Amino acid sequence: MDVEIFPHRLLSAETTEKLLNKLGEIEGIKRMIIQGQRLPAGEHPDRRVINVKGQDIELKVKTGRIFVEIEDKKTMEKIKEVCDEVFPFKYELIPGTFFRRQKTVTDAIKFGKDVDKLPTELVGMTDTVLD
């Protein structure tokens, strides 16, 4: 099961970092993707490295949506509690299917014979095969 978190505002780097860290504490979340418009080239206050669960990540987008793969509906309630705590504005939680779970013909073309090396949890999330 997947959930889209759709805030009614674009998130700052600080809010993105805070949200991802709080979501990272929830059991039942398998993976997350942030989506948004690319930050402009050059200096920008939101172009920085954020730390999520001890891992440094270079933020390259102004976060507009967060897609979360979850194990069950109970996890969705925990996500709602985190969003209520982090967001001082309205947002929507939209259940649906947002992650690919199977390798496609496009993956086979993109990765060639290495397509079998692509871990299931990275299907739809990467353009390179990790050794």
Curated annotation (Swiss-Prot):
Coiled coil: none annotated. It comes from the Archaea. The keyword Repressor does not apply. GO terms for biological process: methanogenesis. InterPro entries: Me_CoM_Rdtase_D. Keywords: Methanogenesis. NCBIfam families: met_CoM_red_D (TIGR03260). MCR is composed of three subunits: alpha, beta, and gamma. The function of proteins C and D is not known. This is Methyl-coenzyme M reductase operon protein D. It comes from Methanothermus fervidus.
